[in-house]
Amino acid sequence: SDLADCRLMAFENVDQATKLWIKGRHFSIARLLGSNISHEQFALLIFRLAPQDYHRFHAPVDGVVGPPKWLEGEYYTVNPMAIRSAIDVYGENTRVVIPITTHDFGTVYLVAIGAMMVGSIVMTAQQGQHVQRNDELGYFKFGGSTLVLLVDAARVQWDDDLLVNSDACIETLVRVGMRMGHARTLPDSVGEETRPR
């Protein structure tokens, strides 16, 4: 479910996101996460919080919070014009990468990205804590900010309205707890039956 009151963009893969929305010349999933994880496997959602929005963010899935990784950086603005410029706002801004291990989606990565006028990102969930969907994970101090959610593309199907709007480069206004998509049904490794994951 949606993890913040914000403006949302949904992409079925990273290549689509960089073609339509993220124009930073050095953007990569490896740089965003501060690791060498390949980008091919991920579908992603981008949540842009404006200064007037509620700045707490919540668990999008049920799971266990892994060790957060803090990456120091800049505080560039996260408005759409900046995201579509040559600056890699997501890979250069201060951010925290929060892995959440889930039953339905494998490990998902939530990246909280600080922005202009945001002094810090505050984590309220702890490593090893089991969270339920919509439990608070943390908050941004006042200002604009962004969250990026990375999910194994083979395990998730975003809602059609989000994909249609994003394909037209239109952000969708969403609220905490609203549906974003669902787990795909994957073939059972033992037989022909399918089961939700």
Which residues does each predicted region cover?
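Contiguous, well-folded functional domains in the mature portion of proteins
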Residues: 1-197
